[in-house]
Amino acid sequence: MSEFTAPVFVCGATASGKTGYALKLAAELDGEIVNGDAFQLFRGIEVLSAAPTEEERGDFSHHLFGVLDPAESCDAGRYFEMVEPVISEIRSRGKVPVVVGGSGLYLKFLTHGPSPLPKGDVAMRAEMERRTLEDLLLELERIDPVEAAQVNRVNKRYVERSLEICLLTGGKASELRDGWERKTRDIEKPLKGFWLIRDRADLHQRIEKRTVQMLSEGAVEEVRRLDGVSGNWEKAIGVKEIRRFLSGEISRDKCEELIVFATRQYAKRQETWFRREKWLERVGL
């Protein structure tokens, strides 16, 4: 396929303005919008996940929004299987796929291919949980000193995962990660993407505004309707807090406060992720 229809990626923290920027790009490039957000894949949580409204979508074609039932499971691997044919079909018509979202791992599967890292082993993880952090670090340092030097050494879960990768593969986690970092896929050459960056105070203000709007425009009703439905959707920020509000455990104001705090923390993690993606062009807003 022509490199002129190669996907363009719009990434950034929640509430950074990705939807508006992606629509502007779609207009300039004769493109179509492709979802790159883990929670906007699900039906029934459009407000909670801040999916683009019908008004925002305008005349542009949108793909992979609200395509999964809330009871379904989805991970980066399944997303990759879903999005590949969508992108190919868009490009076959001479259009540019504009992939927009803040789910870094999902987007990385698309830009670099599926992760070579193995899935977790329940039995092995249970055994590690019984060991001390110091003991795990000593073993990781012996097997993979590079990984031991760069892993978050105060977060036991991260150390467990690094050691788990080494033990399951018989190799070094650092080398597997590095190989994936260097890898690019033909469909994405040349890689083109934008990381939207806002001043911290501005982003926090936008998060607060979005949270107020979300609670007033139907997020509470979405969570109430899906009561008893288990699935990945429950991991969305706001679900836990709204459930506490609905049960009478906390007030609406406290619910709002907790959602704002959780969203800020999530935005910080997103920024950390995208900062590592050196191929992304930084765009200050």
Predicted regions and their residues:
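Phosphate/pyrophosphate-binding catalytic cores of soluble transferases and nucleic-acid-acting enzymes
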Residues: 1-285
